[in-house]
From Swiss-Prot:
It comes from Arabidopsis thaliana (Mouse-ear cress). This is Long chain acyl-CoA synthetase 3. One of its GO terms (biological process) is fatty acid metabolic process. The keyword Ligase applies. It comes from the Eukaryota.
Length: 665
């Protein structure tokens, strides 16, 4: 591949060795880093300095906001300034030190996004504690594992998560000694905590512990671990990703350089809506960037049904979303179009085509059709508060048709990105006003080197004219390893390169397109990982089936499956339920499909599977998977790419049918 418009080659590719290492493609980096990666300023040593420098620079800027509740109704956003937040952070840090917790100790944070979440994080940063975020949606089992694995001694928790935290006792109390509520503590919770020899504090009570005391902040280094972020898990236990101060500050410098170069730099005037989980790297680094630029962060009320009300009240300028959220926006707009009548639909379609055509010619979105923006698309922009200029999509692929639609109607830049917890978030980001990048994650951010590694067993060649292979990343943003799992670290970290497991394809302009997974683990559109082999083993317990292939499209939020049913079991069921016909016609019958789906749901409930692991559509094939159709290997292992190719029509039909059902609902 000739060097694309947005990348430069820094190293040549290498042919592989027969029976040894596979071939690797050339090493590329962002065109904006052709003279080297941006270096952080000397006084930016740790994550604490990100906040400290903004307090010094913009003490009176509004930093953290939440809606005031008056007579049970949500009012305007009420703000704490950077200086006010700093004062609380110092008090909280003094209290932490007063109970004997200090540099290098592990501090958990458990709950939905809130000002207290950020304040707790900054107190950890100030005193060199390892911040260990806990997913808001994780149950007691996973929380217990993380507390014990990370050896968390102090945990801050949202009020309604205290009971979940207490359920981790007595195992967790080998390490966990203190719990601090973001709000109040009930008498029952105090009794339960004392029963397990845990000390529990309300927020105000804990802040008073450090009154009148002063502790010097410890010296921090860039190589110090800042946070242990546990991945949401695929098979087995969650993995603790060690991210250092260096990882975070180099990530921020790279993103800052990119946004400045494309004239979309964040400033202290920007307003960000915090609703994606802070325990996820995507939102965490975006909020760190907002803090770095002394911008304002407003928090939602934690209910997706009233998210749109919070958006209207906050009027954010930057909006981040996972594809599932943008899919809902798209579906809602399409529904309004359908309900709007012939004339409105005709006007909308005309305006859309006109603006889209001008954008294809290279016109920036704001110049492509100002009249259409004012007359037709204004309501879409107002639906996002009226001030949004930048929409960032991450955590899973965004469907090209949705990205294209939103780029036109949202009157804002819609950028898709790609990154891993292990790469400290953003590694690729698409470029504004480049419609050729639809369906891609854009070129590399100017802080990493990228190369593809061939995957011969899947037919991907990194040295071909159309380079495809496993995406490998090198740079200072990378994690330093999996906590207490050197074996897993060595599996993905080879010669300084992080092997992502994602298969990518370089585009002519230097953008990257994600096309496959090297291992049978993938993400659904809401960003959840699915371990497909594990699920197939679980669903195989259903007596009515012989074999099953589970599939999840990264642009959809649920799973579907192709099943080879048991002839004996299905015909027996059909006889009992008066479903007539031969075996093939019985398998085509919708009642039979609903029966199989019901059996899957029964097993899923028994095995306590998560919602996104449920199968929502099924195709029954009376012919078992075989070698004649190249669907299995001689050792009877499934050939997933071939299965997808063979059943593509059925897969598309299942997703189409489910979408139609959702629209009717």
């Amino acid at each position: 591949m000739a060097t694309g418009r947005y990348i430069v080659e820094v190293e040549k590719g290498k042919q592989g060795v027969d029976g040894g290492s596979p071939s690797v493609g050339p090493v590329y980096r962002s065109i904006y880093a052709k003279d080297g990666f941006p270096e952080p300023p000397d006084d930016l040593v740790s994550a604490w300095d990100i906040f400290r420098l903004s307090v010094e620079k913009s003490p009176n800027n509004p930093m953290l906001g939440r809606r005031e509740i008056v007579d049970g109704k949500a009012g305007k956003y009420v703000w704490q300034t950077y200086k006010e937040v700093h004062n609380v952070v110092i008090k909280l840090g003094n209290s932490i030190r007063t109970i004997g917790v200090g540099k290098g100790d592990k501090c958990g944070i458990y709950g939905a996004n809130s000002p207290e979440w950020i304040i707790s994080m900054e107190a950890c940063n100030a005193h060199g504690l390892y911040c260990v975020p806990l997913y808001d949606t994780l149950g007691a089992g996973a929380i217990e594992f993380i507390i014990c694995h990370a050896e968390v001694s102090l945990a801050f928790a949202e009020e309604n998560k205290i009971s979940e935290l207490l359920k981790t006792a007595p195992k967790s109390t080998k390490y966990l000694k203190y719990i601090v509520s973001f709000g109040e503590v009930t008498n029952n919770q105090r009794v339960e905590a004392e029963r397990h020899r845990l000390t529990i504090y309300s927020w105000d009570q804990f802040l008073k512990l450090g009154e009148g005391k002063h502790y010097e902040l410890p010296e921090k280094r860039r190589s110090d671990v800042c946070t242990i972020m546990y991945t949401s898990g695929t098979t087995g236990d969650p993995k603790g990703v060690l991210l250092t101060n260096e990882s975070i500050i180099h990530l921020l410098e790279g993103v800052k350089k990119l946004l400045k170069t494309i004239d979309e730099e964040l400033t202290s005037k920007d307003v960000y809506l915090s609703y994606l989980p802070l325990a996820h790297i995507f939102d965490r680094v975006i909020e760190e960037l907002c803090i770095y630029e002394a911008a304002s962060i407003g928090f939602w009320r934690g209910d997706v049904k009233i998210l749109i009300e919070d958006i209207a009240a906050l009027k954010p300028t930057v909006f981040c979303a996972v594809p599932r959220v943008l899919e809902r926006i798209y579906t809602g707009l399409q529904q309004k179009l359908s309900d709007g009548g012939f004339v409105k639909k005709k006007l909308f379609n005309f305006a859309f085509k006109y603006k889209h055509k001008n954008m294809e010619k290279g016109q920036p979105h704001e110049q492509a059709s100002p009249i259409a923006d004012k007359i037709v698309f204004k309501k879409v922009k107002e639906g996002l508060g009226g001030n949004v200029r930048l929409i960032l999509s991450g955590a899973a692929p965004l469907a090209a048709h949705i990205e294209s639609f939103l780029r036109v109607v949202a009157c804002a830049h819609v950028l898709q990105g790609y990154g891993l917890t292990e790469s400290c978030g953003g590694t690729f980001v698409s470029i504004p006003n480049e419609l050729s990048m639809l369906g891609t994650v854009g070129p590399p951010v100017p802080n990493v080197d990228i190369r593809l590694e061939s995957v011969p067993e899947m037919g991907y060649d990194a040295l071909a004219s159309n380079p495809r292979g496993e995406i490998c990343i090198r740079g200072k943003t990378l994690f330093s390893g999996y906590y207490k799992r050197e074996d897993l670290t060595q599996e993905v970290f080879i010669d300084g390169w992080l092997h992502t497991g994602d298969v990518g394809e370089w585009q002519p302009d230097g953008a990257m397109k994600i096309i496959d997974r090297k291992k049978n683990i993938f993400k659904l559109s809401q960003g959840e990982y699915v371990a497909v082999e594990n699920l197939e083993n679980i669903y195989s317990h259903v007596a009515a089936i012989e074999s099953i292939w589970v599939y999840g499209n990264s642009y959809e939020s649920y799973l579907v499956a192709v099943v080879c049913p048991s002839k004996i079991q299905i015909e027996h069921w059909a006889k009992e339920h008066k479903v007539s016909g031969d075996f093939e016609s019985i398998c085509r019958n919708q009642k039979t499909k609903e029966f199989v789906l019901g059996e899957f749901n029964r097993v899923a409930k028994d095995k306590k599977l998560k919602g996104f692991e449920l199968i929502k559509g099924v195709h029954l094939d009376t012919v078992p998977f075989d070698m004649e159709r190249d669907l299995i290997t001689p050792s009877y292992k499934m050939k997933r790419p071939q299965l997808l190719k063979y059943y593509q029509k059925e897969i598309d039909e299942m997703y189409k049918k489910n979408r139609e059902v959702q629209l009717r609902v």
